[in-house]
């Protein structure tokens, strides 16, 4: 802090108070400001809350109001009025009458019977404009005014001390969760150390351990905040919801400092406190603490989500400071092992080097590092006396050849090689006893040679052309997370060799005299394994695997039918889904008014990006690749979608006529697919049919066939559970649960000639009766009508849409499936379902009522027959509707199909439907019924919405599909009764009972839009009528009344 500047402003403040001391009215003696997190005048983060503290003097008998002004750089003040207390009694209040200014008024409600001097405080934050001016460390003077008196105070904005242990934290306003950081200097990790963070006794919150991050900071800004960091994974994390607890027992080097970031779940209070403790285990005493002056056992912190008044005193206390520069202390016995931290380097050769810095390890185990930026040749060698806990970190971003060699002395500790982005690096370790871990990250060509080792573990995070040579080792484990092209892993004399690779290509594993060797690649292409006494291969997705000299009796194989795949060349289009939190959903009606709906269900926004080359991304995702014939192969992989480019295309192309083998160590067959993708397409209202065959082991195969045209194949990865509410016209509510929300995907178009897909699943079918389920919860559904009005319905029970029992087909739950539907307009909607779609081709449902037929995802076949599918998407009832062909009203429907004279079957979908102004249904034009995600022809338009709440209450547009069955008891032409299906789409009336007079039936038949045979003669006495079709006289038909 600039002490001279502070003294000057204090002198000015004292001179200003000289007059005030002689007055009898209340006065402010002082106003100061401190950082609420550090409890000092030093601030390492401008986002911190600041404590404004004033000292008030109230003379005996005084009751006058006074004012004071806070600098315009501050805002976010507490709710006023708030009290000023003395001995727990309120003696005054503070308010801000004009909220547009920073002028405060202190009001004294009663005259005091004695002289009172007390303090008050409240929280404030810098405004956005004030924060933008703090771009580098500086000291800023803030001036407060009260009754012609100025009080000045200084805040020093300083960079954090990277050589000390520091903490930081805050509370997000968006979701009311807290974050914490602990920054540790690299020397903290000379010995194993525990980091523990807990809530204080006055706070009640839990940690979200899934979000904890560990990073090595390699570049910082002017405040020493990270601008570049590398993730670090070698941490023993024992954290729970109640505490963060981590053990670091590895040497960490190569960065400026180490950062631990962790988070809480949603908070229930506006302020919390936290403690951080560091301990060294196994150092003679039961607990070895890192503390300031060896007196502080914890680092405490207070966080606030909103402003408050009268918080704890801001008096600085050295023994409880939470953000001070706390230097790790060590006993003399500990320091003895680090007395020699550098030594002469026996051999250093640097040629054509712009910058080169090399530090060799010592006898006591200090680290060896090399930075050979832009060098052509770099050589580092260490002496043969190197003994314990050595670490070699190599950084050669642009070097051509770098060689690092350690001699063949007997070692007993861990050797760590970190090789980053080099053209050619060779690391040779002659001999050691315990173990060695070799890590090669993002490099082109590397050679790692070990002549003798008891245990060797090689981890290759992202490599190409890496050679690991082991002459003699008891156990050799190689784990390349992503290895491609010409990778050779060899060992001449290894007792046990294990190769574990989620993604390998062109890999050769050879062992001249290996007692045991196993390969576990979930995705392997073109692999060869030879010369192993016992070989175990587990490859859920393997192509062209060759094994020689194998002696094993524990391999079982199961296979599924091959698929023919073909991918066109070009960039791979991937989709990214962002979904979190609470959303406000806005929909538009025909008159351009907006209806706003609040929803707790996230709405997924799918953005399309084109990737032409692979990226270094890992994680557990589903990788979907589409083929020319609209098939989809889904595999679980450690690679995100964006990394599947030409390699994935090549692998898919190589899958032609291949057998997928799943080898296990048990005697029973296991399925090769743990997850499947179910693909269905609808183009030009063509029918999708399915055939099901069940094998002896209970599995079923579904074959789907559709017509010709383009299709869209894409997929997303969702795993949460949401509740979907749908409403019907009669103001009833039905709730449905779905494992996946609806995602609207922008298209990836694949051109093909046909779509024939076969999928395998374990399922069994059974006939069940559709029933209604009572639910005890209350729901409120808001839907918009065609006239831009909003109707809200509330109901305690869901709807039962059928008056008579209807037999439908359902399937048992049998694992996880993904359903993707496509439209001709190149958009796709994906549904997640536990129940696969099962198609009943040609099934017919009739109701002899005034209501329409209720079906789920129906398509038209022949004479208005229905193919019904069971689905997680509910179906609406269209009650009492009729067809109007003379108006110009828009037809609004969800997933509608047209049959006959512009009749349609309406379905309630998880994707809403928008009203398109000006569209109409006309039999004399080629315009189609406008619907959400519908197939469009000629001049028809369509609209796209992403919405989880269906809008299906229509005010003026009503339609009816009623199917009646009339049975002829006596027929002349037939020897047995038959049924005639008649279309009563636009009728005058509908016969309601068998006692209806025949004249009524004649009138009804004559008015039918399908123009049934005309009735020219009717004889009531004889019970006969004459039927003509054109000029053809069919004769007399007798009937019974």
UniProtKB/Swiss-Prot annotation:
Region (Disordered): 388-410
UniProt PTM comment: The GPI-anchor is attached to the protein in the endoplasmic reticulum and serves to target the protein to the cell surface. There, the glucosamine-inositol phospholipid moiety is cleaved off and the GPI-modified mannoprotein is covalently attached via its lipidless GPI glycan remnant to the 1,6-beta-glucan of the outer cell wall layer.
BP GO annotations: septum digestion after cytokinesis
UniProt propeptide residues: 1021-1041
This protein's GO CC annotations: cell septum; cellular bud; cellular bud scar; extracellular region; fungal-type cell wall; fungal-type vacuole; side of membrane
Subcellular location: Secreted, Cell wall; Membrane
Membrane topology reported for the UniProt record: Lipid-anchor; GPI-anchor
Statement: the UniProt record of this protein carries the keyword rRNA-binding: no
Glycosylation sites: 65, 103, 161, 175, 249, 332, 401, 435, 465, 485, 506, 526, 544, 556, 635-636, 657, 709, 756
Gene Ontology MF annotations: cellulase activity
Lipidation (GPI-anchor amidated glycine): 1020
Signal peptide positions (record): 1-20
Keywords, in A-Z order: Cell cycle, Cell division, Cell wall, Glycoprotein, GPI-anchor, Lipoprotein, Membrane, Mitosis, Repeat, Secreted, Signal
Family annotation (InterPro entries): CST_Regulator
Keyword Secreted tagged: yes
Stretches for region 9 X approximate repeats: 457-962
Induction: Exclusively expressed between the end of mitosis and early G1; inactivated before cells pass start.
Residue stretches of each Sequence repeat: 457-492, 577-606, 613-647, 716-745, 773-802, 811-840, 849-886, 887-924, 925-962
Domain of life: Eukaryota
Role played: Seems to be involved in the correct timing of cell separation after cytokinesis, as separation of mutant daughter cells is delayed. Could either be an enzyme necessary for glucans-degradation of the cell wall at the neck region between mother and daughter cells or a regulatory protein controlling this metabolic step.
The record's note on its domains: The number of the intragenic tandem repeats varies between different S.cerevisiae strains.
Record protein name field: Protein EGT2
Provenance organism: Saccharomyces cerevisiae (strain ATCC 204508 / S288c)
Lineage: Eukaryota, Fungi, Dikarya, Ascomycota, Saccharomycotina
Gene name for this UniProt entry: EGT2
